[in-house]
């Protein structure tokens, strides 16, 4: 899929989420193209900064929930990148699955950038949470 088509899909979905979703929902943005993710980050910083928060999950952090809780701006949809670089992603996903109900305390949707490897792990390690997610397929 070319970048123009990816951009149309991602930003159409993001605009829908911004306009229609006013409670927590987890979305997985499936993309293996780091340059497209960076391009999207730049667009969000320039055009969506008032409504979208972009966070980079540290490679050594073991709790996505705590990371988001400590960094979230509750008035903005949150996008998190960096999961593929996490050194203990299996633990991160297993913990997310166990405490999935606590994520519902967040007021707005969260979008996680994932690649095929992380998506496969999500399905295998956090199936209950995965079944409650929406997917933005950019492959």
Q: What are the roles of these predicted feature ranges?
A:
Residues 43-44, 91-95, 125-129:
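Short, glycine/charged-enriched secondary-structure capping and boundary segments
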Residues 1-76:
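Extended, compositionally biased accessory segments flanking or bridging domains
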Residues 71-92, 96, 105, 109-116:
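Conserved P-loop NTPase "ATPase switch" module shared by AAA+ and STAND
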Residues 33-37, 58-63, 83-90, 117-120:
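Short acidic, S/G/P-rich loop/turn micro-motifs used as interaction or catalytic elements
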Residues 8-12, 90-101:
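Short linear interaction motifs
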Residues 124-139:
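A short helix-turn-beta junction within AAA+ P-loop NTPase domains corresponding to the substrate/partner-engaging
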């Amino acid at each position: 899929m070319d970048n123009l088509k990816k951009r149309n899909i991602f930003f159409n979905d993001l605009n829908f989420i911004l306009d229609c979703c006013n409670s927590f929902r987890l979305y997985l943005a499936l993309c293996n193209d780091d340059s497209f993710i960076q391009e999207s980050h730049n667009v969000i910083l320039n055009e969506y900064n008032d409504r979208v928060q972009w966070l980079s999950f540290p490679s050594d952090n073991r709790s996505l929930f705590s990371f988001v809780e400590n960094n979230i701006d509750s008035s903005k949809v949150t996008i998190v990148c960096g999961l593929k670089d996490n050194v203990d992603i299996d633990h991160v996903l297993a913990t997310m699955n166990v405490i999935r109900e606590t994520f519902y305390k967040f007021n707005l949707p969260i979008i996680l950038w994932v690649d095929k490897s992380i998506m496969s792990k999500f399905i295998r390690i956090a199936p209950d949470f995965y079944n409650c997610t929406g997917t933005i397929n950019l492959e």
